[in-house]
């Protein structure tokens, strides 16, 4: 058995105390010096020292002391020292302390009595405890409750010892009498706990005979009652009906802790709708009444579990759950929205959307903290609602369009993506959305939002008035043409500065950015700078949002403007009968495109135009100069069809994910069927009937069958030594979120007893041992289990290595068996996750740690290699299947996963097929921490060749 520590004392390792110094201080008369010496002795014991020479000194000079602090430290010392020899027999000198303990138990001071009784709770040696039993019993009748409550705990601990029931034969009966007469709440709780632990039937009888008084009992006693109920119902499930009534009565208790435990107990014991509804209501009430954010997060976790198991009941409480949005904490709000979005139905969608709209309006005030981020969460939630239930889109789309000009770019981007999807899925809203978009387009200031808004204008302006308004809006936002004066460009800069004052403009710095398909391009990050005004037409920077963005060097936007104008002109040909008007508009569009090219090639622009944007604008110019039916069809129909296909694929993916979440359970054909209507209902309450029905349903559908998956358990066993070694060892590794539990089975294969056998472990990486190794004795050809816990603090590949050290009677030297290394796999800590394209790009730009792994594989098919990497890294591919379908010689995809510590792992895979059939390219891993980037890179390097 591992020894448990009951205390934690700081110890400064830099100044170890010497045993002789401690001995001198203990022999003196100075009380403070004795206290200090006792503390040093205890610290040495805690750190593995034995110091046996101090025992007699302490018996002679410390034991007689009347000082309370010294007496308390003495008990700590006695708890720590070894009281038995190697054979497990009590050391003879330990009898010396019995008389002192007896005196303490009869001491006139109640504190001395109480701490001595508490000390006896931790004594495991029957020989020491046995002479003290009469004195312990006398303390049950002491006038002070502190003594009585510790006396009850001491009796319980002694009764639980091997043969302890012989020391206190009638202990349960005695404690039951104490329970009926005791007035102190803590002593009463301890008495009930003793009955529950040592004589469960008596505890049950006492509880059932006092059912009406349970709600008036003390909080600590009510908590033990709930613990008893859980224990009894586990062994006797048929009787849980009468206990559930007690739990429901406790739901009205004044203590939040009791109410929370009641709800948890109800859920664990019953599947009846009434019980689940009561538990869910309790969690919702606590969610509103508790101010601690950690408590709120725990309650939301409980509600999430209920939502998973009992969605139909949780649907009724969706508005109660949403009230948690009143908390200013973003984590609480995010969890609340995640739960609520899974509970939306046709019946509650309008109510939910109204509540979300109110929250969006609240974010417009400057009072709330992190308004932009919260607004973004709300917009995403409303987007999800509108996609599931298109009928509500009309009530929210116009409200959200007010935020297209939001200073929070991510929030504005979410709005424009929402509008783009709604205008396609809700054709009835097309006219009103286009009208509103054209009216508010000038407010959009973000370079990432404008292209999407322009695409919507180009695709969905269908009537003559809409097309003309679209062209007019774009022209106004571009301002006067050209973008700079050619004549003024050649003038000396010094003269120019005197003629006109300088104007500030937005200039961009460029850095690599990952596109939607996973390839790299250049991203412009706007920053303010100054231009000489003579080269820029006066007033140009304030005349329109598109103009301001173009002057920063954002020529990707210029290419989008050209494409949008091209689509609008081509559509104008279809709806405008006057050729003169069409030609006039064509000329205007060509002038705009040529001006953008001119700006891109001039020294006025902070950056020259990139080749992609230049070629795109040139294509638009050629198309407007030489229009034909085939190209017209591609521009006006094919682009829209691609978007429709993308939306359909997204909806299909979401449906598949929803189906995957829904776990189906199956019953065996020969399972018994219990017909509810043929059962006796006599004396059963409605709740008991409901509970029985739910149990029958679960049994019928196979939900009671739990597959322990023993084969998987066997796969986790690692052999640590060879079969020919004198000591054979194997470990079963259980990986938890924050620690690793090792269960090492050690077998003595020799004919001798192994003494002082010790499992010595060490770690490499971000792993830490949390306990000191213990010494054991192992009989010939016997086995034992040694447990070790290792703390994990980050997602990083670690190694556990060590030895088994032992002694035998024949050989004086210690024998060492070296163990095989245990490698802790990063895959145990990361799981596939989903995030939006925008969130992926944002994280990719922010994360500083990148690990670039060159592709080196024997696999020759791009898609096969991607699937192999996904399987090897336990990540989710965010790139749509249509984007990586087909054979084109190259492939780019984004992968995403999340660790149990909340760390994000981003992977971009870019590969190309060479002429000889081999694959080349790079896999880039980015994360906020170095550990996950390096560990994942090592894993990919190991696995990419197609190894297991």
Curated annotation (Swiss-Prot):
<dbReference type="GO" id="GO:0016192">
    <property type="term" value="P:vesicle-mediated transport"/>
</dbReference>
<feature type="repeat" description="HEAT 6">
    <location>
        <begin position="391"/>
        <end position="428"/>
    </location>
</feature>
<keyword id="KW-0968">Cytoplasmic vesicle</keyword>
<feature type="repeat" description="HEAT 3">
    <location>
        <begin position="127"/>
        <end position="164"/>
    </location>
</feature>
<dbReference type="GO" id="GO:0006886">
    <property type="term" value="P:intracellular protein transport"/>
</dbReference>
<dbReference type="InterPro" id="IPR002553">
    <property type="entry name" value="Clathrin/coatomer_adapt-like_N"/>
</dbReference>
<dbReference type="InterPro" id="IPR011989">
    <property type="entry name" value="ARM-like"/>
</dbReference>
<dbReference type="Pfam" id="PF14806">
    <property type="entry name" value="Coatomer_b_Cpla"/>
</dbReference>
<dbReference type="GO" id="GO:0030126">
    <property type="term" value="C:COPI vesicle coat"/>
</dbReference>
<dbReference type="Pfam" id="PF01602">
    <property type="entry name" value="Adaptin_N"/>
</dbReference>
<keyword id="KW-0653">Protein transport</keyword>
<dbReference type="Pfam" id="PF07718">
    <property type="entry name" value="Coatamer_beta_C"/>
</dbReference>
<protein>
    <recommendedName>
        <fullName>Coatomer subunit beta-2</fullName>
    </recommendedName>
</protein>
<dbReference type="InterPro" id="IPR016024">
    <property type="entry name" value="ARM-type_fold"/>
</dbReference>
<feature type="repeat" description="HEAT 2">
    <location>
        <begin position="92"/>
        <end position="126"/>
    </location>
</feature>
<keyword id="KW-0472">Membrane</keyword>
<dbReference type="GO" id="GO:0005886">
    <property type="term" value="C:plasma membrane"/>
</dbReference>
<dbReference type="GO" id="GO:0000139">
    <property type="term" value="C:Golgi membrane"/>
</dbReference>
<keyword id="KW-0963">Cytoplasm</keyword>
<dbReference type="GO" id="GO:0005198">
    <property type="term" value="F:structural molecule activity"/>
</dbReference>
<feature type="repeat" description="HEAT 4">
    <location>
        <begin position="274"/>
        <end position="311"/>
    </location>
</feature>
<feature type="repeat" description="HEAT 5">
    <location>
        <begin position="312"/>
        <end position="349"/>
    </location>
</feature>
<feature type="repeat" description="HEAT 1">
    <location>
        <begin position="49"/>
        <end position="87"/>
    </location>
</feature>
<dbReference type="InterPro" id="IPR011710">
    <property type="entry name" value="Coatomer_bsu_C"/>
</dbReference>
<keyword id="KW-0677">Repeat</keyword>
<keyword id="KW-0931">ER-Golgi transport</keyword>
<comment type="subunit">
    <text>Oligomeric complex that consists of at least the alpha, beta, beta', gamma, delta, epsilon and zeta subunits.</text>
</comment>
<dbReference type="InterPro" id="IPR016460">
    <property type="entry name" value="COPB1"/>
</dbReference>
<dbReference type="InterPro" id="IPR029446">
    <property type="entry name" value="COPB1_appendage_platform_dom"/>
</dbReference>
<keyword id="KW-0333">Golgi apparatus</keyword>
<keyword id="KW-0813">Transport</keyword>
<comment type="function">
    <text>The coatomer is a cytosolic protein complex that binds to dilysine motifs and reversibly associates with Golgi non-clathrin-coated vesicles, which further mediate biosynthetic protein transport from the ER, via the Golgi up to the trans Golgi network. Coatomer complex is required for budding from Golgi membranes, and is essential for the retrograde Golgi-to-ER transport of dilysine-tagged proteins.</text>
</comment>
């Amino acid at each position: 058995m591992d020894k448990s520590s009951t205390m934690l004392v700081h110890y400064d390792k830099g100044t170890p105390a010497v045993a002789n110094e401690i001995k001198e201080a203990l022999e003196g008369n100075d009380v403070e010096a004795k206290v200090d010496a006792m503390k040093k002795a205890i610290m040495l014991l805690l750190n593995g020292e034995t110091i046996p020479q101090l025992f007699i000194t302490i018996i002679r000079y410390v034991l007689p002391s009347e000082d309370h602090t010294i007496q308390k430290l003495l008990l700590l010392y006695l708890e720590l020292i070894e009281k038995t020899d190697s054979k497990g027999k009590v050391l003879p000198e330990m009898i010396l302390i019995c008389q002192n303990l007896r005196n303490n138990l009869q001491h006139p001071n109640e504190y001395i009595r109480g701490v001595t009784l508490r000390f006896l709770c931790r004594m495991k040696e029957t020989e020491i405890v046995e002479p003290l039993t009469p004195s312990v019993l006398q303390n049950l009748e002491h006038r002070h409750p502190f003594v009585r409550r510790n006396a009850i705990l001491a009796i319980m601990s002694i009764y639980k010892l091997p043969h302890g029931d012989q020391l206190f034969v009638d202990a349960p009966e005695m404690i039951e009498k104490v329970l009926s007469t005791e007035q102190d709440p803590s002593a009463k709780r301890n008495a009930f706990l003793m009955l529950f632990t040592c004589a469960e039937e008596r505890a049950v009888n006492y509880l059932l005979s006092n059912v009406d008084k349970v709600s008036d009992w003390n909080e600590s006693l009510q908590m033990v009652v709930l613990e008893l109920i859980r224990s009894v119902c586990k062994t006797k499930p048929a009787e849980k009906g009468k206990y559930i009534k007690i739990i429901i009565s406790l739901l009205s208790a004044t203590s939040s802790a009791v109410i929370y435990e009641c709800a948890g107990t109800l859920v664990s014991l019953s599947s009846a709708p009434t019980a689940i509804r009561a538990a869910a209501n309790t969690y919702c009430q606590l969610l509103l009444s508790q101010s601690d954010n950690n408590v709120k997060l725990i309650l939301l976790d409980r509600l999430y579990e209920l939502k998973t198991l009992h969605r139909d009941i949780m649907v009724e409480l969706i508005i109660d759950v949403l009230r948690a949005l009143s908390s200013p904490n973003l984590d609480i709000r995010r969890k609340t929205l995640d739960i609520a979005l899974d509970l939306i139905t046709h019946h509650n969608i309008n109510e939910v959307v109204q509540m979300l709209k109110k929250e969006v309006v609240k974010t417009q005030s400057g009072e709330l903290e992190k308004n932009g981020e919260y607004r973004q969460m709300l917009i995403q939630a409303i987007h999800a609602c509108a996609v599931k239930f298109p009928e509500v889109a009309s009530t929210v789309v116009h409200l959200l369009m007010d935020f297209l000009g939001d200073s929070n770019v991510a929030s504005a981007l979410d709005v424009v993506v929402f509008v783009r999807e709604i205008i396609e899925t809700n054709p009835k809203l097309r006219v009103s959305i286009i009208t509103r978009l054209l009216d508010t387009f000038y407010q959009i200031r973000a370079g990432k939002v404008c292209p999407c808004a322009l695409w919507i204008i180009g695709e969905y302006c269908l009537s003559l008035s809409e097309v003309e308004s679209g062209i007019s809006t774009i022209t106004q936002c571009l301002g006067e043409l050209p973008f700079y004066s050619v004549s003024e460009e050649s003038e000396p800069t010094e003269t120019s500065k005197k003629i006109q004052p300088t104007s500030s403009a937005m200039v961009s710095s460029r850095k690599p950015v990952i596109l939607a398909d996973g390839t790299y391009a250049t991203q412009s990050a706007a920053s303010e700078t100054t231009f000489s005004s003579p080269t820029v037409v006066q007033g140009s920077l304030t005349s329109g949002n598109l103009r301001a963005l173009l002057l920063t060097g954002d020529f990707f936007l210029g290419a989008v403007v050209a494409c949008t104008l091209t689509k609008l002109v081509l559509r104008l040909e279809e709806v405008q009968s006057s050729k003169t008007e069409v030609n006039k508009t064509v000329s205007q569009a060509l002038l705009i495109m040529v001006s953008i090219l001119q700006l891109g090639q001039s020294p006025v622009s902070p950056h020259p135009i990139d080749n992609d944007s230049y070629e795109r604008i040139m294509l638009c110019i050629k198309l407007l100069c030489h229009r034909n039916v085939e190209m017209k069809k591609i521009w006006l129909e094919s682009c829209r069809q691609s978007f429709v296909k993308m939306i359909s694929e997204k909806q299909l993916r979401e449906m598949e994910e929803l189906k995957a979440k829904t776990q189906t359970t199956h019953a065996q054909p020969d399972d018994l069927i219990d017909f509810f209507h043929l059962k006796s209902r006599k004396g059963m309450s409605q709740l008991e009937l409901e509970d029985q029905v739910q149990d029958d349903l679960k049994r019928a559908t196979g939900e009671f069958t739990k597959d322990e998956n023993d084969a998987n358990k066997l796969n986790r066993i690692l052999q640590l030594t060879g079969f020919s070694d004198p000591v054979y060892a194997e470990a079963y590794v259980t990986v938890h979120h924050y620690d690793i539990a090792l269960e090492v089975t050690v077998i003595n294969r020799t004919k001798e007893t192994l003494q002082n056998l010790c499992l010595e472990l060490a770690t490499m990486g971000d792993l830490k041992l949390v306990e000191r190794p213990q010494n054991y004795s192992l009989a010939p050809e016997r086995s034992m289990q040694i447990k070790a816990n290792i703390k994990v603090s980050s997602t990083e590949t670690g190694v556990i290595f060590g030895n088994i050290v032992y002694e035998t009677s024949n050989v004086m030297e210690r024998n060492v068996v070296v163990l095989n290394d245990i490698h802790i796999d990063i895959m145990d800590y990361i799981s596939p996750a989903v995030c939006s394209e925008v969130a992926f790009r944002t994280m990719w730009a922010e994360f500083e740690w990148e690990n670039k792994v060159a592709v080196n594989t024997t696999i020759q098919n791009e898609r096969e290699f991607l699937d192999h990497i996904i399987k090897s890294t336990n990540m989710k591919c965010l790139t749509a299947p249509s984007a990586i379908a087909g054979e084109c010689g190259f492939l780019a995809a984004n992968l995403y996963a999340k660790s149990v510590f909340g760390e994000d792992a981003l992977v971009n895979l870019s590969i190309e097929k060479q002429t000889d059939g081999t694959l080349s390219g790079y896999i880039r891993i980015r994360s906020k921490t170095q550990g996950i980037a390096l560990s994942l890179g090592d894993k990919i390097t190991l696995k990419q060749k197609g190894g297991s």
